Amino acid sequence: MLRTVKLNAGYKELHILFDVDADIKKNSITAVVGPNGSGKSTLLKSIFGLATVHSGQVFLNGGEITSLPPHTRTKLGIAYLPQTDNVFANLTVEENLKIAAYTVDKEEVKDRIDAALDAFPELRAFMKRKAGTLSGGERQMLAMATALVRKANVLMLDEPTAQLSPKFAEIIFDRILKLRDDLKLTILLVEQNVQRALEISDNAYLLVSGRVAFNGTANELLEHEKFEKLCMGIVD
């Protein structure tokens, strides 16, 4: 469904990723793991059009999207949710959801918002509250709900449980699984809790210094005899 081919990317003249080949399967969760500075977030940003692609290609459903701007990729069904600043803090929950529906036909808006709230029912109690007053976990739910309103079918999450309590982090992990299982989304996950990310993922890519050091099933990486060393970037 989503592929990168010999992707070399970074920011202006700075090169972060080198010859990254990735093949993200439809209706799956793929974890992108690796030590700090390995290029995990840059890979997501490259797919969404927020990083500089020096060479290589990005494909969605067989069509090349390498040169398309982010707003066009959004219309094609790709959603990228960064760790912070992923909602409009000064607007209410309801307003955030309505803004997410700006490209939706008027007669569909209510149904889209209702469907998103069905996936994240906790938000119904906060519709008139400013997003900035929500807890970190509630804001993350709102961000994912806005992606559903936009009818995203590829959801890229950049450290969605960062700074959340263990209890709320588990709620977010559970919702990620339900987005795959119930709504058939394709999810690309960068997560600081590597162990938990791999436990809920189908497949995994390990990046070390901007290069793919491992790709396979998440279980294969979890059970690798050098798992801890690999995740620290120690590759023999």
Curated annotation (Swiss-Prot):
UniProt entry tagged with the keyword Cell membrane: no
UniProt keyword terms in alphabetical order: Amino-acid transport, ATP-binding, Nucleotide-binding, Transport
ABC transporter domain ranges (all copies): 2-234
Superkingdom of the organism of origin: Archaea
Keyword Protein biosynthesis: no
Gene Ontology MF annotations: ATP binding; ATP hydrolysis activity; branched-chain amino acid transmembrane transporter activity
Listed GO biological process terms: L-amino acid transport
Residues noted as binding ATP in the record, renumbered to the chain: G34, P35, N36, G37, S38, G39, K40, S41
Pfam family, one: ABC_tran
Protein family according to the UniProt entry: Belongs to the ABC transporter superfamily.
Biological function: Probable component of a branched-chain amino-acid transport system.
Protein name stated in the entry: Probable branched-chain amino acid transport ATP-binding protein LivF
Lineage of the organism: Archaea, Methanobacteriati, Methanobacteriota, Archaeoglobi, Archaeoglobales
